[in-house]
């Protein structure tokens, strides 16, 4: 799972909230952190991402614009979860074609459940237990 933000504390908050195993029926998650757009694009282009969580407030390129770009440009785009600072910004995440939205401050139960729901939607391509 790829976590993108230019701020390390945001990446850490996401990893901590979602946890290593968001649900008992899912395998352990291996996180890859990205602080720049080039890292996200390279990982997605290489097919190395099962799910991406993008910081909607990242700079200079925000997660919402990046989500829309990925959905438009990558044939088999992985599911994308966008995190936003304000609940009122959920509509922007919908515009970005994100598969789900997380709102800061992150609630660990909600974050884990949201990610688990998206991973379950992958069916047989969900990450394996490691």
Regions flagged by a language model, labelled:
Residues 1-19, 52:
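Conserved acidic segment of CheY-like receiver
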Residues 13, 106-115:
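C-terminal output helix
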Residues 52, 101-102:
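Two-component signal transduction core modules
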Residues 85-101:
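Alpha4 helix (beta4-alpha4-beta5 surface) of REC/receiver domains from two-component response regulators
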């Amino acid at each position: 799972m790829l976590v993108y933000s230019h701020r390390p504390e945001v990446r850490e908050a996401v990893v901590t909230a979602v946890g290593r195993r968001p649900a008992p029926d899912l395998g352990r998650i291996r996180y890859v952190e990205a602080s720049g757009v080039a890292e996200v694009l390279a990982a997605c282009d290489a097919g190395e991402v099962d799910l991406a969580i993008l910081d909607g407030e990242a700079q200079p390129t925000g997660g919402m614009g990046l989500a829309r770009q990925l959905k438009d440009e990558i044939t088999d785009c992985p599911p994308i979860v966008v995190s936003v600072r304000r609940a009122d910004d959920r509509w922007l995440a919908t515009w970005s074609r994100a598969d789900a939205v997380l709102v800061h401050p992150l609630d660990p139960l909600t974050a884990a459940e949201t990610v688990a729901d998206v991973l379950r939607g992958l069916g047989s391509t969900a990450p394996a237990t490691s």
